[in-house]
UniProtKB/Swiss-Prot annotation:
Name of this chain's protein: UPF0178 protein CKL_3490
PANTHER family in the cross-refs: UPF0178 PROTEIN YAII (PTHR35146:SF1)
InterPro entries membership: UPF0178 (IPR003791)
Assigned protein family: Belongs to the UPF0178 family.
Superkingdom in the source lineage: Bacteria
Amino acid sequence: MRILIDGDACPGKYIIENIARENDIEVIIYCDTNHILKSNYSTVVTVDSGFQSVDMVIVNKVRSGDIVVSQDYGVAAMVLGKKAYAINPKGYIYHEGNMDKLLFERYISSKVRRTGGRTSNPKKRTKEDDKRLRENLFQLILNGKVYKGEDW
């Protein structure tokens, strides 16, 4: 098991690294050339910048049993198809039961934006988000994939 992080947009990296360190799990953070990241624990892999370049590298590198941390529903859907686990940086676990709803909401939001409409901005990160990430990531690690998180 490894933890692969979409580092272009992942608050909470320090929480993930601390849990991984405690459990002796390799962490790989992927980012593009527009984001310079450093870590004392994780391996940082920088890829060329481009539309979804980090996402595609993660999908190509993920293995069965890995955990992927990403805000992108499309990435989550693809890694679930590869028998890996996916969790949002706010600690929500992606699973087969919520992917259709999330992907449909993403589709509707993109349609609204294309027609000039506005969608809501993401909410600011809270201490509850940190707690949820810590608890649910730990559950994924301990149990492989026993879903005990909150649904969306």
